[in-house]
Amino acid sequence: MDKTQLILLGLPIFLLCSDLFNLFTPPPPKSQHQSPPSISETLDFPAQKSTGVGYGNTVEINFCISCSYKGTAVSMKKMLESVFPGLDVVLANYPAPAPKRILAKVVPVAQVGVIGLIMGGEQIFPMIGIAQPPAWYHSLRANRFGSMASTWLLGNFLQSFLQSSGAFEVSCNGELVFSKLKEGRFPGEIELRDLISGTMTKPFVTGSY
């Protein structure tokens, strides 16, 4: 086995092991920083925040992070905060359904199984009672480097698909005002502004900002 073949073999295995490590490793505990003691004093101007037309209202934008919707969510957040001063806009991930998330965790295991079968099938098949490996195994074995690379790429694509929810859900004060899952599209800025205005506890008046 020459140097090029070793690289082609090692790269997919390294990336696959990296995916498995990131998937099953729990996130590190958040370090608790000691905040310096705050000096409590009364200021003359904090009441300005309460004069904003959006003060006291909360908008939640739950979107699919793995679908690259973050840019759209941030743009909508900035627009709403500029139109409704004082409005609290919260961005959060909208996860895929539980069955899809479970299948997404199975994919890396299947990738390891397929790659292991390609590399050591001649020993694995007799262990499970199959004396002669099937014809499809010989086809994969004949081009084992391409087969392993394809297994890794297709597995990553499938895992990304299973982790995607395709959601862009907007709620105002706990009430759903727009759902991409139902509408099949993103909301327009003017449309979203009007939806939020009709749901706020302090109605938005044109020209009041």
Curated annotation (Swiss-Prot):
Disulfide bonds join C64-C67. The keyword Signal applies. InterPro entries: Selenoprotein_Rdx-typ (IPR011893), Selenoprotein_T (IPR019389), Thioredoxin-like_sf (IPR036249). Residues 1-22 form the signal peptide. NCBIfam families: CXXU_selWTH. PANTHER family: SELENOPROTEIN T, SELT-LIKE PROTEIN. This is SelT-like protein. It comes from Arabidopsis thaliana (Mouse-ear cress). The lineage of its organism: Eukaryota, Viridiplantae, Streptophyta, Embryophyta, Tracheophyta.
